[in-house]
Amino acid sequence: MKKAVHFGAGNIGRGFIGEILSKNGFEIYFVDTNKAIIDELNTRHSYEIGIASSSPEKISVSGLFGINNGENPEDVIEAIAQADIVTKAIGPNILPYIAELVAKGIQKRKEENKQVQIDIIACENMIGGSEFLEKKVAEYLSDSDKVYLANYIGFPNAAVDRIVPGQKHEDLLYVEVEPFCEWVIDESQIKNKSFKLEGVHYANNLEPFIERKLFSVNSGHATVAYSSAYKGYKIILEGLQHKEILSALKGVQKETRALLLAKWPQYFTEEDLMSYHQMIISRFANPKIIDEVTRVARTPIRKLGYDERFIRPIRELNERGLSYQNHLDIVGKIFAYQDENDSQSVQLQEKLSTMDLQRLIEEVTGLSNKKIILEIELVIKKYKNDSK
């Protein structure tokens, strides 16, 4: 039986990646530091996924094992050495922390003279996630290790899309997900061409698809979350019923379509993107998905990053002379967002009260364009004054 190692036994790992790998006949080794989850996986070797729709459905995922990388790192290294594929869904900020372990797994494959090619795929909400991980892994490799990596280890970028709300169940492993799911892998970066995963779309150029997803789903979800928080809503579904919040979402979508059509006219049409964006609205409005605003709005500093879901579109729309007023408006709401249980929100509010505003904008967004910085400064002040 083919073996898969998956880092991250959280909701996306179990509720999406694990489902696809299991359907493709893989024995799956989940790697995580959550002892309770890992122990449960090793006791039951299976779990159920619930599909949150008008016609509820349960899917069984089996052939599973768990490895606690905090307690048993050597077992992770051995699992990577024996694996046919390695995947990850742990969050962009955590990727650097597993790089050394992945490097040791690659070194063990080299020591055992394994000449079977393998792909290591980061399934994260970021552009170039696998390439980013590869650079971090390379920091722990010798020159000869790097030659082996170049010949036998692929790091194809990927885009994943499925809404998995925050949830708690008596069954530790049970997870509820929306019906929609999409996993796209950059075929041009794949090393192991001996199999293709059913349920995965392969593209020769991933960039247009990952930008469509990040600038539509992630930017859109965040638009609803920060707009809902500003209006005092706690649940995404409730916020979306407010006409101003729906209007904000549609405004961001309109600007996103303009950018995608300007960048990728050979991949998308206005009609395609309109249909895609209408589908996204219906996904956010799924009455069976009760998603908390705080989950979607968490880590506001990260979401204000230079290559993230608002600042990157703003930069690229500005370069093309296209409107980005709706994106800019949400940036103002992100700076106004307050959640005492979110360390980044607390940190951002502290900096707003102590730092020069333009300097703070430069620090958080990485921007140097004075025009955009000034526009962000004005919209921050607008929401600061409105909240008084």
Curated annotation (Swiss-Prot):
A Gene Ontology biological process term: mannitol catabolic process
Record-linked InterPro entries: 6-PGluconate_DH-like_C_sf, 6PGD_dom2, Mannitol_1_phos_5_DH, Mannitol_DH, Mannitol_DH_C, Mannitol_DH_CS, Mannitol_DH_N, NAD(P)-bd_dom_sf
One Gene Ontology term of the molecular function aspect: mannitol-1-phosphate 5-dehydrogenase activity
Residues involved in NAD(+) binding: A4, V5, H6, F7, G8, A9, G10, N11, I12, G13, R14, G15
EC class of the enzyme, as a word: oxidoreductase
Keyword list, A-Z: NAD, Oxidoreductase
EC number annotated for this UniProt entry: 1.1.1.17
Transmembrane segments: none
Taxonomy, superkingdom: Bacteria
A Gene Ontology term for the protein's cellular component: cytosol
Reaction catalyzed: D-mannitol 1-phosphate + NAD(+) = beta-D-fructose 6-phosphate + NADH + H(+)
Alphabetized NCBIfam families for the sequence: PRK02318.1-3, PRK02318.2-5
Family listed: Belongs to the mannitol dehydrogenase family.
Protein name according to UniProt: Mannitol-1-phosphate 5-dehydrogenase
Biological source species: Lactococcus lactis subsp. cremoris (strain SK11)
